[in-house]
Design a protein with these regions (language model features):
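Mg2+-dependent phosphoryl-transfer enzymes with acidic/Ser/Thr/Gly-rich catalytic loops
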Residues: 1-5, 22, 188-270
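Residue-level signal for inorganic ion chemistry
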Residues: 32, 43, 67, 152, ...
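Short, acidic loop-to-helix structural element flanking the phosphoryl-transfer center
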Residues: 19-35, 83-90, 130-134, 192-206, ...
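Short active-site oxyanion
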Residues: 36-40, 59-61, 150-151, 213-214, ...
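Conserved acidic, metal-coordinating active-site core of Asp-based
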Residues: 103-105, 109-218, 222
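Active-site phosphate-binding/coordination module
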Residues: 21-124
Length: 270
């Protein structure tokens, strides 16, 4: 059998509602890897919020973070690493417009740090940023923003986060890629224009000298649309956002709570 590239989203897909990997999922992924298939974590999360899962799964493959802005080989210097950023002016402007977009918080995300407007645990969950507690150096201050971020993350009180994403795309004249993220959380993520999970996977396939027909992808949310459409075979979770279904080749019969990805991989490869 041709060895496959298996792109897996984390939240709402590989992880359960407690943001954990089940033992069955871990065992299945390890068996798949041992057979020579390449499991690629492909997530909106920054690296610091995905690295523990990478270690738990004992992966040695590249990882895609920030919805495609960062493609890298964790823990190693890799000649094919690609790190893309967006102009910091967008971060500064969104902070000024914080009330217009009803944002609980706005954060500039970098590979190894972040700045958040409300480092307050009653407003933002520190675990969302891969830390136990917020520190003074996490406080957003305009003068601290000297470099362009990989992405901007914001949590909004607006009832329809999809409508807000559309509205912000129009406001910024489609110069950013603005996606919903985080399953049930009202979170928007802004990445560089044209950047998405498929964009990063296409780059990775070129690096690996592989064809997209050998790419399988699993996702559940709006930010997985391009990835599922691009893959040779795209699977939407049973719990997927209905808007994702037209882009998938198949919907799984099980949710992320029911180890949907692991059972699908078992049926395909074990």
């Amino acid at each position: 059998m041709t060895k496959k590239i298996i792109a897996v989203d984390l939240d709402g897909t590989l992880l359960n509602s407690e943001s954990k990997l089940s033992d069955f999922t871990k065992e299945t992924i390890k068996k798949i890897s041992e057979k020579g298939h390449h499991v690629i974590i492909t997530t909106g999360r920054p690296y610091r919020m995905a690295k523990d899962f990478y270690r738990e799964l004992e992966l040695h493959t590249p990882m895609i973070n920030f919805n495609g802005s960062l493609t890298h080989l964790p823990g190693q210097t890799w000649e094919h690493e690609r790190c893309l950023t967006l102009d910091k002016k967008y971060l500064l402007d969104m902070v000024k417009r914080k009330e217009d977009i009803q944002a609980d918080f706005i954060a500039g995300e970098y590979r190894k740090k972040f700045y958040i407007t409300a480092p307050n645990e009653e407003i933002a969950d520190p675990k969302l940023f891969g830390v136990e507690n917020f520190q003074p150096e996490n406080q957003f201050k305009p003068e601290r923003v000297t470099k362009n971020p990989n992405c901007i993350l914001l949590q909004t009180r607006v009832e329809d986060k999809y409508a807000l994403a559309d509205e912000m795309n129009r406001f910024y004249q489609h110069q950013l890629a603005i996606n919903t993220w985080g399953g049930p959380l009202n979170i928007l993520e802004c990445t560089p224009k044209g950047v998405n999970k498929a964009f990063a996977l296409e780059y990775l396939l070129n690096v690996m000298n592989r064809d997209k027909k050998d790419l399988i992808a699993f996702g559940d949310e709006h930010n997985d649309t391009e990835m599922l459409a691009f893959a040779g075979k795209g699977y939407a979770m049973k719990n997927a956002n209905p808007a994702l279904l037209p882009y998938a080749d198949e919907q799984l019969p099980l949710t992320n709570e029911e180890d949907g990805v692991a059972y699908a991989l078992q049926n395909l490869f074990l």
